[in-house]
Amino acid sequence: MKNKFLATLFLACSISTVSAQTPVYMDDAQPIEARVKDALSRMTLEEKVALCHAQSKFSSAGVPRLGIPELWMSDGPHGVRAEINWNDWGYANWTNDSITAFPALTCLAATWNPDMSAKYGKAIGEEARYREKDVLLGPGVNIYRTPMNGRNFEYMGEDPYLASVMCVPYIQELQKNGVAACVKHYALNNQELWRGHIDVNLSDRALHEIYLPAFKAAVEEGGAWSIMGAYNKIRGQHACHNDFTLNKILKDDWKFDGCVITDWGGAHDTYEAAVNGLDIEMGSYTNGLTSESVFTYNDYYLANPYLQMLKDGKVPMSTIDDKASRILRLIFRTAMNRQKPYGSVATEEHYAAAREIGNEGIVLLKNAPVIKKGAPLLPIDAAKYQNILVVGDNAVRLLNQGGGSSELKVKDMVSPLDGLRAVYGDKVAYAKGYAAGRPMYGRADEIPQNVVDSLRAEAVEMAKKADLVVLVGGLNKNHFQDCEGGDRLEYGLP
């Protein structure tokens, strides 16, 4: 009995000693704010500054000396993007980074169902966690100012209230996986053409009633852990280091305690980035560096230039302490969160969620009978139609491939043509009908007129012999359509 007592006492003392030796910042039982304060007190100025800028295309540094890990980010918001190379935009060609492609956020918003938003956030969060991402760059909540915006498909429509309601469950469920939402693009990034140069001027009423409500809901109701700054200027100052929108509105008025992260290449000035609310700088092309070169990350605005300004007393030390505190808080919530689940990817549950969201988001304008007083056309009666013609490039195009940063590498995808053939078999014929060109970023194919005429003529002739024609049209992720970096040139469909 005495030996058992001594053994128990020794074990208790050992646990107490280990606990006493564990730094506060490493102790999960301590409040996050206490951990942030303790970690900050142990860091050098150089280590604090190193937190504030990229170390690769999609990661920022931790503090190796203290065992604090780096942050890994991934494009979203419709799925976790395939792995990108360390220093350039090329794909790493991994064989294990395929995921589920979820419907576009426009489709999610069209469900008008917050439960669908919660399912979306839960599933995409599990996939991001499985892929060991700490920050998912989404959801996008910019308002449709015009239907010509090439990136509208990434957003939740033109209604500020709808976007506000729908983004909250997405964020909450995503972050339950220990993955931060990075709500984008804050703010007023409502066109792609010249997005890095335009200066947006608007009234306070338009700003607060139309363009900011979804961001405000994301912060105050959704509890978003990070925000992505936009490329454009707002009232003369770049959005990624805009004193009015970042310091005054986001951090003071809304009490945002997370990180502001640039869109890639969105920083332009060290002093403004230091004092106007930017926390992490990603993807900059400073000092002659281009998107094709190996980046010297220490040349970033919030790297050595910022460090030197701090040492010279040109910016207050309080700026780096605030930035480092916010970044540490984000790391403790994500990369150092030992309670986060393992995650999963491309599961039947995720496929079912994507299918359910897609079904609820379908907008059927009209399901009229083919003949007066007859039955509605849909669903297609296999016994009635023996020769079904499918027309359209989108019937065979995988729309997850293209669109810029939102393009995805899927584990499995069924095209509309394959889906119809799976049900109706050899009754289904196909004609392309038109040429859309390849889905490319920054440029578009020019289609010769003789090709256009030939494809149209073929489809017309085949349609004359068909009992039923199914046209699969719409935009197709090409540049100057629904693709990052360019806006639509016309209202018409290809």
Regions found by a protein language model. Name each.
Residues 20-494:
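Glycoside hydrolase catalytic-domain context in secreted enzymes
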